[in-house]
């Protein structure tokens, strides 16, 4: 008679049935049975240097594939280290399944070494958090974890596996993945949306991350081009319409009011496509009571006093947009928007023409753009550089600029770039971070070397938490406090981890240095001193722009 598999072995069978081909994590004493079950499977397990890195890797894997990325930790401190990355996936809408080891069920009611109630701990930052307490339920728990992670607005889920349950024989088998069927919007809502758009005087499309997740880039672009409607994207929707499309008015979401706010000041109808309040609050784009909002998404709107749609078109986003195109009609060009775009293009070109060093942010991004192909991937960390990326890094396809902007966690870029390069080895992948963010997960460069995943990291060095310094200077008359620090020699640090290390000393060195770094078969780190005096200059300039509207 064939010996029955353990719960840990069946759990791994379930992961394989879900199509899992890679996992990220750190083994621990309470996950030993699971680790050996993974060893005997077809799944590639990548040991990382910090569980937060594992969670960010799973997060970006999920963003780019639409399938849940999987991360694993042991109990206690291993699980708490996962929390930041799991929370990031939850708020940013990235499908992720976190698996944690746990003490045996016989120890849970006692004061116990490293024991925390992980199911309760993960509940506020996941769509579903469940513990396997009976071996025969493993199939259902795994299937539901993936279903909830991937359906609707994606997000994180959590499975907790006690040590003694992992060892028990399990009379269970994997459940089959169900075919996900498209949900189509109510035709009366389609017609109502088409009527509002047709009758609008100055409509604006606001495209959010949901449009990217819904693979709606072609539909958004066609809607804009055929109905002559300008498009503003959130940070996480960069590339939803090519930046060189004449109706692209680029990105909204930096703390200051920008040129695009003038567009919203004049609009009567906002067509919100895949828009998520958690990423960019309505106050940032100037939602008003006299605006009419059309909400188009795969999920109903999260309403608040500033965001109350007149009509909600809930269903497959692309299909909804094509249906709206069949009933909406508009003629005439949005002259103000087109003129505003010309102003923005001229301003960006002028700001990128500076040859000084430390380099200006706009010049760095212009040079990066020249080296990167249209479908190459930039992964942004969080800091002042993120604001400049949002404003000055042109994108032409979705998922070519990955930004954490729901949870907005520092330390995202290096593990995120690792996952992107793992998935797309043929593409250039750049992690762009500040010196603060770099030090939060730089240890994963060793993981990249060991696993032979050669992406490039570009560090903007200013020896401070630049975004907070910028906000302090804005609010306290140019003064700042508690944001400055010293750095190690990043070039030598990179080389100590067997990466290639570079330092840029002149503006004209950046492009050839990037080109050389991308030719390497090992990870590379480039350090570029950045002139963040540009931050306050930009703030002053934007105040003048908004005063002239």
Feature map (PLM): residue ranges:
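Short, surface-exposed loop/turn motifs that are enriched in glycine and acidic residues
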Residues: 183, 354, 358, 480-483
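A generic structural signal for residues located within well-ordered alpha-helices
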Residues: 30, 53, 215, 359-360, ...
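N-terminal alpha/beta PP-like core and its mobile active-site loop of ThDP/TPP-dependent enzymes
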Residues: 1-328, 367, 371-377, 454-457, ...
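Active-site diphosphate/adenylate-binding microenvironment
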Residues: 11, 16, 31-35, 342-420, ...
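Phosphate/pyrophosphate-binding active-site segments
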Residues: 2, 195, 289-386, 493, ...
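Thiamine diphosphate
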Residues: 99, 107-114, 303-306, 312-314, ...
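Charged, low-complexity, helix-prone segments enriched in Lys/Glu/Asp/Gln
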Residues: 61, 336-354, 420, 456-458, ...
């Amino acid at each position: 008679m064939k010996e029955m598999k353990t719960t840990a072995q069946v759990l791994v069978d379930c992961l394989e049935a879900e199509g899992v081909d890679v996992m990220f994590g750190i083994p621990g004493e309470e996950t030993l049975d699971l680790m050996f079950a993974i060893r005997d499977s077809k799944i590639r397990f990548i040991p990382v240097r910090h569980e937060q890195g594992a969670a960010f890797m799973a997060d970006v894997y999920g963003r780019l594939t639409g399938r849940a990325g999987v991360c694993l930790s042991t109990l206690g401190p291993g699980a708490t280290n996962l929390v930041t990355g799991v929370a990031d996936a939850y708020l940013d809408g990235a499908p992720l399944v976190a698996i944690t080891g746990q003490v045996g069920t016989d120890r849970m009611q006692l004061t116990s070494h490293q024991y925390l109630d992980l199911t309760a701990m993960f509940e506020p930052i996941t769509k579903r958090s469940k513990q396997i307490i009976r071996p025969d339920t493993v199939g259902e728990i795994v299937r539901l974890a993936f279903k909830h992670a991937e359906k609707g607005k994606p997000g994180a889920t959590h499975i907790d596996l006690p040590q003694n349950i992992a060892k028990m024989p399990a009379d269970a088998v994997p459940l089959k993945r169900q075919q996900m069927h498209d949900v189509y919007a109510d035709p009366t809502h389609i017609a109502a949306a088409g009527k509002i758009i047709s009758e609008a005087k100055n409509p604006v499309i606001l495209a959010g991350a949901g449009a990217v997740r819904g693979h709606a880039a072609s539909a958004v672009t066609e809607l804009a081009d055929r109905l002559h409607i300008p498009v503003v994207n959130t940070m996480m929707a960069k590339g939803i319409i090519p930046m060189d499309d004449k109706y692209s008015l680029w990105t909204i979401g930096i703390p200051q009011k920008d040129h695009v706010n003038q567009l919203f000041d004049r609009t009567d109808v906002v067509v919100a496509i895949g828009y998520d309040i958690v990423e960019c609050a309505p106050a940032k784009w100037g939602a008003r009571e006299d605006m009419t909002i059309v909400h188009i998404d795969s999920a109903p709107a999260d309403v608040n006093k500033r965001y109350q749609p007149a009509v909600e078109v809930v269903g497959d986003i692309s299909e909804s947009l094509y249906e709206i195109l069949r009933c909406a009609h508009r003629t005439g060009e949005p002259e103000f928007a087109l003129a505003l775009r010309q102003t923005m293009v001229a301003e960006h070109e002028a700001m990128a023409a500076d040859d000084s060093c430390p380099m200006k942010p706009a010049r760095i991004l212009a040079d990066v753009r020249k080296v990167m192909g249209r479908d190459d991937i930039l992964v942004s960390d969080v800091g002042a550089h993120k604001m400049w990326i949002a404003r000055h890094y042109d994108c032409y396809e979705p998922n070519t600029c990955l930004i954490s902007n729901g949870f907005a966690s520092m330390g995202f870029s290096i593990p995120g770039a690792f996952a992107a390069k793992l998935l797309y080895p043929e593409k250039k992948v750049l992690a762009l971070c500040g010196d603060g963010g770099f030090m939060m997960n730089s240890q994963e460069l060793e993981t990249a070397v060991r696993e032979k995943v050669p992406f490039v990291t570009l560090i903007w060095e200013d020896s401070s938490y630049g975004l907070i310094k910028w906000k302090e200077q804005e609010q306290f008359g140019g003064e700042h406090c508690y944001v400055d620090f010293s750095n190690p020699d990043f070039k030598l640090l990179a080389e100590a981890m067997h990466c290639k290390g570079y330092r840029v000393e002149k503006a004209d060195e950046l492009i050839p240095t990037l080109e050389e770094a991308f030719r390497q078969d090992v990870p590379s780190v480039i350090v570029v001193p950045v002139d963040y005096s540009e931050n306050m200059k930009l703030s002053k300039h934007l105040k003048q722009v908004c005063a002239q509207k």
